[in-house]
Amino acid sequence: MKHTVRSIAALAGVSRGTVSRVLNNQPDVSPEVRARVLRIIEETGYQKDARFSGGDTICIGVIVAHWQDEYFTNSTLRGVRMAAREINAGKVSLEVRRMNSRADEEYIRLCEELLELGVRGLVLNAPDNFVIAAEIERLHRAGVAVVTYNSDLPDSRRICHVGQDLLKSGRIAAGLMARCISPKDQVLVITGNMEFRSHRVRVDGFLTHLEELGFGADCYALAECYERYDMTYEAVRRALSVHPRLHGIYMATESVQACADAIHGCKRRMAVVVNDLTPEAKRLLRRGTIDFVVEQDFSGQVYRAIMVLHELLAYGHRVKQPITYVDTSIITQEML
């Protein structure tokens, strides 16, 4: 049987975090507990991963979330490469893990795997729920500093969040929409998974500002489509048939292509505002199918998140602000 941090913790009757602190020679472990854990490590023949068993190299883990659109995966990896070119390679190394789903169980499995490797910092984009918050708490107790990007968990023990000002992004989208339609018109709002704070807050900003601009509280329909083409297509087609005064669609997340296909051939004028300048959004913006793109620096979020941990762990530079916002910009057809 190959022993892991989890099995050592079970045998010693302590948490995984305690085992990690012992393995990494960190404080806050009583002499008795440290001796017991070290004895079990010796008895079981447990070996820490050879890549991180010696020297003073600090390992930072990056968990790449699973997206339907590879644009976001590629943008995340681009941010990792940007950071890799700037970090002090003699002091810091990066370990990247890609997810195959958005299941909480996979997040936890990858966190455990990276903890096993001895990471001192972790960058991740995850849903805002108690399961992930509890995992971040365990990582914190193990001495691992966590920085979130894109979607925050503000009530967790993460040390910092790097992302778009989501409320502002939604408000910008509402302002653009209000310039294209009448307050008497209906708006369809398509979002992904409301468990992700990035999806939830952006929609809140959009709807709140629409009401401030004179639109009624009942002017919209909301569809949670999990960034799936089929669900988005059906939601748009259904809204077109049910709401004769539907003249605006806000795509708070993907799939923009499904929205474009659903409104193809529609006789009425349709204003479409989307987030993120994906290849599909760029093509549809050029064609005039969509009107505005509210863009965020996705690669920059990952880059900055890694660099926050780099500065903290390699040089002891404390995090000054709990939230760092990247720039938000508006893209029109004329800018392409």
Over which residues does each language-model region extend?
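Hinge/beta->alpha junction and helix N-cap segments in small-molecule ligand-binding domains
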Residues: A65-Y71, E95-E106, D128, V162-I172, ...
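Amphipathic helical "hinge" segments at domain boundaries
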Residues: K48-R109
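Short helix-capping segments at alpha-helix termini
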Residues: E86-G90, A142, L210-A217, V242-P244, ...
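Hinge/cleft segment of the Venus flytrap/periplasmic-binding protein
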Residues: L210, D297-L336
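Hydrophobic alpha-helical
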Residues: G121-R138, F206, E224-A281
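Conserved beta-strand elements of the Class I
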Residues: G61, Q186-I190, H247
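N-terminal helix-turn-helix DNA-binding module of bacterial transcription factors
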Residues: M1-D56
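Flexible loop/hinge segments that line or gate small-molecule binding clefts
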Residues: N129-K168, T278-I290
